[in-house]
Amino acid sequence: ELRGVARRWFEAAPDADDVWAFSEFRRPAQDLDVKINYEGVYVQLSETTVLYQRRNSLVDIAVYNPAFNEFDDDSIVTRLGFLLLDKTLGELNVEMWIGAIEFVRENPDDAVPISEFTDVLHDLTSEFPLIGNRNWQVAEAMVDDHPIIIRVLPPLVTLAAPLFETHVAVAFAYDAHETGLPRDEETMQALGSIEDALDSAVANDGRCVAIETGQGQRLMHFYVDSSSEVIQRMEEVLALWDRGNVNLVPSFDPGWEEVSHLRF
């Protein structure tokens, strides 16, 4: 995963002028009423259609373009399909908001033109901004017949903060109810206080992106800039936790794979 490298390259690039401008990802075409030549076949961007199903902060899609049927090799169709998505939606939108992708050779009955599908992505961008007041998503899962409460800060992808390449897992043991959830309000308040203290310690050198609570443990997922002293500051905060075992484990994870299972 080279998103961090691309961001550093972009930040070091010269300012844009009348001729040249730099970008760290492929931007969408300004005009979809154009054709591209792919493997000797002319492909009309505007003929791309999408059948979509929105989840919480992701959209699963089936993508169709008549040009797919010009190729017998499915791997060529897949490469062309991803190119069309980058050309029509932009690489940023594809990576942040698209979940499962299927490239199909027949136009689905309820598919919409790609130009209309962009409205769905605009809605997601507004609902889950990358700066300012950000919106947490909450879900519940069952593990060994015990509930796990999950909170995530979409989008859980590298492009949300590409310079934060180190995953830090912080696990707290707490007084648990028989369900595995925090026993009482006092325990909840203690967990909230240590979360706030960690957020203050991390400051602008990282962020908490997901929290899992259940089975007597709260697991917080941070992504941080390891070139700072942020991990040392976090350890100083954790030394104050006196309600159970606590564990901090950093790992280099530029692709944010450690939280990929929490995208929903």
Cite the ranges covered by each PLM segment.
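Short beta-strand->loop micro-motif that forms the acidic, two-metal-ion catalytic signature
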Residues: R218-F222
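Glycan-association/targeting regions that enable binding to alpha-glucans and other polysaccharides
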Residues: P254
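Charge-rich, low-complexity segments
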Residues: L2-E195, A203-V209, G214, D225-Q232, ...
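A common structural junction motif
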Residues: L238-N247
